[in-house]
């Protein structure tokens, strides 16, 4: 007679920073025979992305107030009650053994209803500064997990769940030692393109002598790739063997592992992935992030000499060119090793184990 599998409900939505770590845990639990159901917003990216991973969805409509008008704020009580009712119906249908909240607006009403109906709630905060939802729910959850130490009081530091292939990358010492010739630079703008990086990096490279100039792979998002090409051409740098411009990178593990240096924003998942792989990084935090959390994310590595932090207001072609002139593969390798030493490569397993334990089960092995 086959026993009924235990069920995990993942609550996450809105941005990749919430959704991708949730997917990492979901796949880990599925590999152990668990049934996984996702609770998200039908208007969020999760509604398109999660079903592609073979995970069924339940939906709750709820949004935030930040930057919204008076009408939205006045409608909050009604919208919250509606979201709570939708959450209650979803929980009754799914009957989860444990609920994992990974962030996003829907986590607030769904988390409240989870607790009020007596189901165990596990929370995970991805950023170095916790959002309001997790600050409230942390007082009600069975277990509270954080990616950065100190993000929430009395929480367990697990790190951020990442894709398995990133955690399995060859150690930086071996990778850097096997290379010779020009430095290899990876610039990651993400889907939004990071216009500041697209403008400054080509001009900085143009200030370097050809012998000093690294080989570059610059990712900028499909909407920005034409402008990026124009920026490189205006700087006198034609695309070719030493300059590759791409709209998207499918295999980030290989891209990180092939680079001596990464220049990028400092979202929570980016910082976690760079540390897990062990690669030198120059972080330029997005200046308009909520609570300036990208700065504190980057500081976690930068304060340990495991990365360099430059605020966007301070970034210039001259500053970047001068800094690049002072780097060697040896200095970048040392930075990469410090970064790897601060990583939590088993974060996915740890979060999954906590979920299983709260449900009264065990999780076997590692991913």
UniProtKB/Swiss-Prot annotation:
Membrane disposition: Peripheral membrane protein
Recorded family membership: Belongs to the glycosyltransferase 28 family. MurG subfamily.
Name of the top EC class for this enzyme: transferase
Keywords: Cell cycle, Cell division, Cell inner membrane, Cell membrane, Cell shape, Cell wall biogenesis/degradation, Glycosyltransferase, Membrane, Peptidoglycan synthesis, Transferase
InterPro entries noted in UniProt: GlcNAc_MurG, Glyco_trans_28_C, GlycoTrans_28_N
PANTHER family named in the record: GLYCOSYLTRANSFERASE, UDP-N-ACETYLGLUCOSAMINE--N-ACETYLMURAMYL-(PENTAPEPTIDE) PYROPHOSPHORYL-UNDECAPRENOL N-ACETYLGLUCOSAMINE TRANSFERASE 1
Pathway the protein takes part in: Cell wall biogenesis; peptidoglycan biosynthesis
Broad class of where this protein is predominantly found: membrane
Enzyme Commission numbers on file: 2.4.1.227
Protein localization: Cell inner membrane
Recorded superkingdom: Bacteria
Organism: Burkholderia thailandensis (strain ATCC 700388 / DSM 13276 / CCUG 48851 / CIP 106301 / E264)
Stated name of the protein: UDP-N-acetylglucosamine--N-acetylmuramyl-(pentapeptide) pyrophosphoryl-undecaprenol N-acetylglucosamine transferase
The keyword Cell cycle appears for this protein: yes
GO molecular-function term, one example from the UniProt record: undecaprenyldiphospho-muramoylpentapeptide beta-N-acetylglucosaminyltransferase activity
One Gene Ontology CC term in the entry: plasma membrane
Positions with a binding annotation for UDP-N-acetyl-alpha-D-glucosamine: 15-17, 127, 163, 191, 249, 294
Function, in words: Cell wall formation. Catalyzes the transfer of a GlcNAc subunit on undecaprenyl-pyrophosphoryl-MurNAc-pentapeptide (lipid intermediate I) to form undecaprenyl-pyrophosphoryl-MurNAc-(pentapeptide)GlcNAc (lipid intermediate II).
Enzymatic reactions: di-trans,octa-cis-undecaprenyl diphospho-N-acetyl-alpha-D-muramoyl-L-alanyl-D-glutamyl-meso-2,6-diaminopimeloyl-D-alanyl-D-alanine + UDP-N-acetyl-alpha-D-glucosamine = di-trans,octa-cis-undecaprenyl diphospho-[N-acetyl-alpha-D-glucosaminyl-(1->4)]-N-acetyl-alpha-D-muramoyl-L-alanyl-D-glutamyl-meso-2,6-diaminopimeloyl-D-alanyl-D-alanine + UDP + H(+)
GO biological process, one term: cell wall organization
């Amino acid at each position: 007679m086959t026993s009924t599998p235990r069920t995990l409900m993942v609550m996450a939505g809105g941005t990749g920073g919430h959704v991708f770590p949730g997917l990492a845990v979901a796949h880990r639990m599925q590999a152990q025979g668990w049934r996984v159901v996702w609770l998200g917003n039908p208007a969020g990216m999760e509604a398109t992305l999660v079903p592609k991973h073979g995970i069924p969805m339940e939906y709750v409509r709820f949004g935030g107030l930040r930057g919204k008008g008076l009408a939205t704020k006045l409608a909050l009580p009604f919208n919250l009650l509606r979201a709570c009712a939708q959450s209650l119906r979803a929980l009754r249908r799914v009957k989860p053994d444990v609920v994992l909240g990974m962030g996003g607006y829907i986590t607030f009403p769904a988390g409240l209803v989870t607790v009020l109906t007596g189901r165990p709630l596990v929370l995970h905060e991805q950023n170095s500064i916790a959002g309001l939802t997790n600050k409230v729910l942390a007082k009600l959850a069975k277990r509270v997990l954080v990616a950065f130490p100190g993000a929430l009081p009395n929480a367990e530091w697990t790190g951020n769940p990442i894709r398995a292939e990133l955690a399995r990358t060859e150690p930086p010492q071996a990778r850097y030692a096997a290379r010779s010739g020009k430095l290899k630079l990876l610039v990651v703008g993400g889907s939004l393109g990071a216009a500041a990086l697209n403008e400054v990096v080509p001009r900085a490279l143009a200030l370097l002598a050809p012998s000093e100039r690294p080989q570059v792979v610059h990712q900028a998002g499909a909407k920005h790739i034409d402008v990026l090409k124009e920026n490189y051409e205006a700087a006198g740098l034609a695309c070719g063997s030493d300059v590759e411009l791409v709209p998207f990178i499918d295999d980030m593990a290989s891209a990180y592992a092939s680079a001596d240096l990464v220049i990028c924003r400092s979202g929570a998942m980016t910082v976690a992935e760079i540390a897990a792989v062990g690669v030198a990084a120059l972080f330029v935090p997005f200046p308009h992030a909520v609570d300036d959390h990208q700065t504190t994310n980057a500081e976690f590595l930068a304060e340990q000499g495991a990365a360099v932090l430059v605020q966007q207001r301070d970034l210039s072609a001259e500053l970047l060119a001068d800094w690049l002139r002072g780097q060697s593969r040896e200095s970048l390798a040392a930075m990469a090793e410090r970064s790897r030493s601060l990583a939590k490569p088993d974060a996915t397993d740890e979060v999954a184990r906590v979920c299983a334990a709260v449900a009264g089960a065990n999780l076997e092995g590692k991913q």
